[in-house]
């Protein structure tokens, strides 16, 4: 396969000196070394099939040798093969041409080969916006998902982390957010699939096509079957496309990264292959630097923004692991998906007591929103504290006040669940968008005890209070 990079050469060429898996040492003529991060290309014949492999310069070793990381499997690559310098870093297509299409980390279109090669391309290695260009205003991003809008509100132009172990709903929540942003705001989204399953990528593409939101989304994939160099760079490729929409087309953009842990994991693999001494728990010593270079580019500039939603796999549900811990430092809001809540059949399985947002304060969200959120959290916290007593002595031993608190907490817990648009075909129930003011009013009324007479099952996975009342009427008719 010929890549866009293979067609742009500087005339500088060298020879492969050593191949160790995805790491390739290349010898160049004296005084003619390519710059760090430059893309190199080498032609390979494997079983009578010609292909071009792209390498990225990672180190200058001395003696006119550079060490590069391959962006494709190195099968068929031999010592002595000619390597050409493109004279610039890996670049990807930008602009409206990328919408509705799938790309790899090198900017090659996978669903329509050749697309975007003739248009504008940007290097994936870019500097973050200057300090005087940053937006100082803080604004809430309304999602229509009750538990998020009320208890862990997202910042427009902020960075949001979705934490959780395997199988608790991170990818489903990301798909739902893409759908909602396209439907409610007609916004542009960029999805970067970092080291996840190829099946999930295919499912996402087909679902988005089916739901009519694909034309507003660019997809960039570097999946788990690809070399670590690709998985380390694909997030930067997606971010570069998003930066163009923000800086040139002046749009508000949503950047989805699934999964940011795989970015750290790929960096660890590359670091080991390059011979660096590992740091804590075997991670690369440059983990904080690499994460910072990516995260500092995700920000709001004057009048426009990139809001990033990042799924974070937590290895063995251990939040002290260096990879998720490093991500924490950059986030404006964290949404923790909890296996114990998912086991109750409540989706999204957001843990309201451990999820956080830096903007949940009266000066930003308003006094009423803040007070209702605090009342909800206090009721849920009190319920959690009473669980040990209930487990040992039963509900009958609680005071009347505590009994009311526990019953309200159960209703709140179930009402925090919600039907998703992307889950309609699985649940058979239509998705729901609940405006923020309706969410605040609904939880205020539940906390006030207006719905204490309603059975708990009336609150399961519904939208607003209208749905609850309709469900209650159905039960009465039966």
UniProtKB/Swiss-Prot annotation:
It is found in: Cell membrane. One of its GO terms (molecular function) is proton-transporting ATP synthase activity, rotational mechanism. Pfam families: ATP-synt_ab, ATP-synt_ab_N, ATP-synt_VA_C. Its EC number is 7.1.2.2. Keywords: ATP synthesis, ATP-binding, Cell membrane, CF(1), Hydrogen ion transport, Ion transport, Membrane, Nucleotide-binding, Translocase, Transport. InterPro entries: AAA+_ATPase, ATP-synt_VA_C, ATP_synth_F1_bsu, ATPase_a/bsu_AS, ATPase_alpha/beta_chains, ATPase_F1/V1/A1_a/bsu_N, ATPase_F1/V1/A1_a/bsu_N_sf, ATPase_F1/V1/A1_a/bsu_nucl-bd. ATP binds at residues 164-171. Gene3D superfamilies: 2.40.10.170, Bovine Mitochondrial F1-atpase, Atp Synthase Beta Chain, Chain D, domain 3 (1.10.1140.10), P-loop containing nucleotide triphosphate hydrolases (3.40.50.300). It is a peripheral membrane protein. GO terms for cellular component: plasma membrane; proton-transporting ATP synthase complex. Its main location: membrane. It catalyses: ATP + H2O + 4 H(+)(in) = ADP + phosphate + 5 H(+)(out). F-type ATPases have 2 components, CF(1) - the catalytic core - and CF(0) - the membrane proton channel. CF(1) has five subunits: alpha(3), beta(3), gamma(1), delta(1), epsilon(1). CF(0) has three main subunits: a(1), b(2) and c(9-12). The alpha and beta chains form an alternating ring which encloses part of the gamma chain. CF(1) is attached to CF(0) by a central stalk formed by the gamma and epsilon chains, while a peripheral stalk is formed by the delta and b chains. Belongs to the ATPase alpha/beta chains family. NCBIfam families: atpD. Produces ATP from ADP in the presence of a proton gradient across the membrane. The catalytic sites are hosted primarily by the beta subunits. This is ATP synthase subunit beta. It comes from Corynebacterium kroppenstedtii (strain DSM 44385 / JCM 11950 / CIP 105744 / CCUG 35717).
């Amino acid at each position: 396969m010929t890549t866009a990079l293979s067609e742009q050469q500087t005339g500088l060429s060298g020879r492969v000196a050593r191949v160790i898996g995805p790491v390739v040492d290349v010898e160049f003529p004296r005084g003619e070394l390519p710059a760090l991060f430059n893309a190199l290309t080498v032609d390979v014949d494997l079983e009578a099939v010609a292909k071009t492999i792209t390498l990225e310069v990672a180190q200058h070793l001395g003696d006119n040798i550079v060490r590069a990381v391959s962006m494709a499997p190195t099968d068929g690559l031999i010592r002595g093969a000619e390597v050409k310098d493109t004279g610039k870093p890996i670049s990807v297509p930008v602009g409206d041409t990328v919408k509705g299409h799938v790309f790899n980390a090198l900017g090659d279109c996978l669903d329509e080969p050749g697309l975007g090669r003739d248009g504008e391309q940007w290097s994936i290695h870019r500097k973050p916006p200057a300090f005087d260009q940053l937006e100082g205003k803080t604004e809430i991003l309304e999602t229509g998902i009750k538990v998020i809008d009320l208890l862990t509100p997202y910042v427009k132009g902020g960075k949001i982390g979705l934490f959780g172990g395997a199988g608790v709903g991170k990818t489903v929540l990301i798909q739902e957010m893409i759908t909602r942003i396209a439907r409610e705001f007609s916004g542009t989204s960029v999805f970067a699939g970092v080291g996840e399953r190829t099946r999930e990528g295919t499912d996402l593409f087909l679902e988005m096509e089916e739901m009519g939101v694909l034309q507003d989304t660019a997809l960039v994939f570097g999946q788990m079957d690809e070399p670590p160099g690709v998985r380390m760079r694909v997030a930067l490729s997606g971010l570069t496309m998003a930066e163009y929409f923000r800086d040139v087309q002046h749009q508000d953009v949503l950047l989805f990264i699934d999964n940011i842990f795989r970015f750290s994991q790929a960096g660890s693999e590359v670091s080991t292959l390059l011979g660096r001494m590992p740091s804590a728990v075997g991670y690369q010593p440059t983990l904080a630097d690499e994460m910072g270079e990516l995260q500092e580019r995700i920000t709001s500039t004057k009048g426009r923004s990139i809001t990033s939603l990042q799924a974070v796999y937590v290895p063995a549900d251990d939040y002290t692991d260096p990879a998720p811990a490093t991500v924490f430092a950059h986030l404006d809001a964290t949404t923790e998906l909890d296996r114990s809540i998912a086991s109750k059949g409540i989706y999204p399985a957001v843990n309201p007591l451990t999820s956080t947002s830096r903007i949940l304060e009266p000066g930003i969200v308003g006094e009423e929103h803040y007070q209702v959120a605090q009342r909800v959290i206090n009721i849920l916290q009190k319920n959690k504290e009473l669980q040990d007593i209930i487990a040992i002595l039963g509900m009958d031993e609680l005071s009347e006040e505590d009994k009311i608190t526990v019953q309200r907490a159960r209703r709140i817990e179930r009402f925090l669940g919600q039907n998703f648009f992307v889950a309609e075909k699985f649940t058979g129930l239509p998705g729901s968008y609940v405006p923020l003011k309706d969410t605040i009013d609904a939880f205020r009324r539940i906390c006030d005890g207006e719905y204490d007479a309603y059975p708990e099952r009336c609150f399961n996975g519904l939208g607003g209070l209208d749905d609850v009342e309709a469900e209650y009427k159905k039960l009465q008719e039966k």
